[in-house]
Each structure stands twice: as structure tokens, then as C-alpha cells.
Amino acid sequence: MAQALGEDLLSELQDDSSSLGSDSELSGPSPYRQADRYGFIGGNSGELRLCQPSADLIRQREMKWVEMTLHWEKTMSRRYKKVKIQCRKGIPSALRARCWPLLCGARMCQKNNPGTYQELAAAPGDPQWMETIGRDLHRQFPLHEMFVSPQGHGQQGLLQVLKAYTLYRPEQGYCQAQGPVAAVLLMHLPPEEAFWCLVQICEVYLPGYYGPHMEAVQLDAEVFMALLRRQLPRVYKHLQQVGVGPLLYLPEWFLCLFTRSLPFPTVLRIWDAFLSEGAKVLFRVGLTLMRLALGTVEQRTACPGLLETLGALRAIPPTQLQEEVFMSQVHSVTLSERVLQQEIRIQLAQLSKSLPGPAPLPQARLPGAQAIFESQQLAGVRESTKPEIPRIVVQPPEEPKPPRRKPQTRGKTFHGLLIRARGPPIEGPSRSQRGSASFLDTRF
């Protein structure tokens, strides 16, 4: 039955493997409206047909994902390693809309907060944030078919999602880097699901990234430099010599989740792994880019100054950024969660005195889908087993019972009781006569 349901689901999804808005938001002749499989007009997604999996292999992966999502709790409880492996291979395009909300926990958040997004979307937004959001709408993927028209459902949906987040977290407000992140989510998800995915990314995967001080970005910048010094010491030395600090390139990478830095197919593969394994994927991607751009002596020699070095980080050959080739190198980077957390604690101790805002809390960052799933399951158990408030019940006083009376047996013999029970005695000689007469003289 599960297989039949999975095949029905695949048949519904395979007719749209890119975006939700592939219809007529553009005007003009059809040649000018032709978009690639990801929805970019003129094929601007940077897609290269190298090392692409075959149709049969894609079909097999789709069936595996359908089977896992149909039994998601069982899969995450017992077979998370399989989920991680499949995420590294890449989630099929037709199933990202189903898998991303499950991986990041947005599906459970939406279930636990029914009607919240509708209330936020219907409420008027803060004029301060609405003006800033309105200026940024046309900058998010202007060559994507969803976001070309100002009145199209892409820009309008993006406006509603970003406005809803400013109302959901008014103390944080809006950060410009949330725009491209929310736009990528809207390419695959309806606005409500995109909103809850954005909430999970901002509050669970990358807490402190999009606040007013962005203190977590500063912390991760120092962590990245420490990891770079350990794994690529010559590249680290070159950056120090030319004066390229991490804040010159890392915010664009990490805050936007590489949406503005890499080809779109590669970005999607990074997101698949990021939603599965957490923030350490971002560090692995950053280290891989450093090695590809400045890993050789010739590359470093060709970059004698700051501008040349920053240009080299943006001029990596597209063939090296193709998703299959690039992601295989990303996953080969040795970086465990334990090492990352250890380095975070070291750098946090050094930065806590100099940060203008509150110190970031690295323990609030959950390392991927498994930790999020376990956290939500634990929260559900606590909610279901919540103890009731004790109640004091006052019972009315009972009426006193009369004391039990003992039967009056004083002065009463057994013979007297027997006479009352059996009636008058049988006629015969008196007791004195019976005592003096013999047994044979007794009359019956």
C-alpha cells in the first residue's frame, strides 16, 4: 500500500520539478519567457550537464525518499544515517517541497501553531520594516520567473513571508540576508511552509545571525579562521598578509547560505546537506572554496593584494563548482561536530568581552535534523505528560453513628436461652426426683 501511495505521489510531483510559478507572469513573445528547469529565464542558473545522475537513478532515489517520508518518525528514530546519506546524494527536485519542512522541523511547528501565519499575514506590518522590505523585493533573483513582476505571486509572497517574520519576532525585525533565503524557500514551498522553514533556519540552525548585532556571525568568522589556520595554513597566512579578514566575504556566504555566491544547482545541494547536518556544512563549503581559489602556490602568487584575493574567491571556474564535483569535495572535508563545538567555545571566550550585544549562545544551535527531531519529540512528550494542578477536595463531615450496644447476657443461663428457643420443657420427674431415681425408673 505504501508503494502504491508513493507511486501516486511521484506521478503528481514529477510534472513540476522546479518552481511554483512557471506560468505567465511575464509578457512578450514565448522565446523571451523560456526558463530552465529551475525557473531562471535564459538558463541563468549555471547548470552544467556534467556527471548528472541517470533517470533510473533519480527514480530510485525518489522512491527511497517517498518511503522514508511516509514513515518519517520511524525513519528519524532508527535510520537517520540513511537520511544523511541520501541528503548528501541530493534530494530529488520533485520532493524538496516535501522533505525540507520535515528535515528542519517546520512541519511540526506549523502543526503546533495553526492559524499563526494567517494572522501575521493579515496584520499590518511595521512601516519601518515594510519600507525596507519593499525596496529589496526586486533584488531577489530578478531573472527568476517568480520574481520578475512586482505584482506577481513571487514578490507578493516574499513580502508576506518577510513581513510575517518581523511580526513574529519584532525584537529582531528584518535582515536583508533573509530575502534571498526566503526567496529560495518560496521557489519550492507555499508561503506558510516557507515562513516556518525561515523561522527554523533563523532560530534553530543559525540563531543570532539575523539579529540587530549579528553577534553569531562575528563568532563564526573567528571560528572559520581558526579552522582555516588548522586545515589550510598557507591560505590562512596569505589572507593575513594581504589583509583579507573573514568579515569581507563570510557574511555573504553564511548569511545568504551561498545563494549569491554559487550556481543554483550547487546551492540546492548545499541546502540539502545543511538542513540535514547543520551549520558545520557551511564551514565545510567555505573551506572548500578557499582551497579551490587559493590552494596552490600559483593561485596565491597571482593575488598579491586584497582586491585580487577577493576577486579570486569569486572567480572559481564553473566546472569546479558543478554540484556533483563540488559536493564530493565538501563532504571530504574533515570537520566533526565535536571539533566545531570545541572551537566555538574557545573563540567565544575570547570574543565575549568585546561584543557590543549579548554573548551568543552556541548551545542554542541544534546540529541538524536529528537533533531537531529529538528536541521536538521530547517537547511533545513533556506536553503530553504535563502534570495536572493538584486540587483540594473538601468532603462534608459524616453523621455520627450511634454506639453499638452489647447484648445483655448477665444472669441468663444456657438452659434459659434453650427454653426460649425450643418452647416449654417435656413433662417428667422433677430435677430432684431424677437425681435420686435410677435410670431404669425414669419414664419417657
UniProtKB/Swiss-Prot annotation:
Residues 404-444 are annotated as: Interaction with calcineurin. The record marks 176 as: Glutamine finger. The keyword Cell inner membrane does not apply. Residues 1-32, 383-444 are annotated as: Disordered. The keyword Cytoplasm does not apply. GO terms for cellular component: cytosol; filopodium membrane. GO terms for molecular function: GTPase activator activity. Keywords: GTPase activation. The record marks 135 as: Arginine finger. GO terms for biological process: B cell activation; calcineurin-NFAT signaling cascade; ERK1 and ERK2 cascade; negative regulation of B cell activation; negative regulation of calcineurin-NFAT signaling cascade; negative regulation of ERK1 and ERK2 cascade; retrograde transport, endosome to Golgi. Residues 90-278 form the Rab-GAP TBC domain. InterPro entries: Rab-GAP-TBC_dom, Rab-GAP_TBC_sf, Rab_GAP_TBC_domain. Residues 403-413 have a biased composition (Basic residues). Residues 16-28 have a biased composition (Low complexity). Inhibits the Ras signaling pathway through its intrinsic Ras GTPase-activating protein (GAP) activity. Acts as a negative feedback inhibitor of the calcineurin signaling pathway that also mediates crosstalk between calcineurin and Ras. The arginine and glutamine fingers are critical for the GTPase-activating mechanism, they pull out Rab's 'switch 2' glutamine and insert in Rab's active site. Interacts with both calcineurin and HRAS. This is Carabin. It comes from Mus musculus (Mouse). The lineage of its organism: Eukaryota, Metazoa, Chordata, Craniata, Vertebrata. The gene is Tbc1d10c.
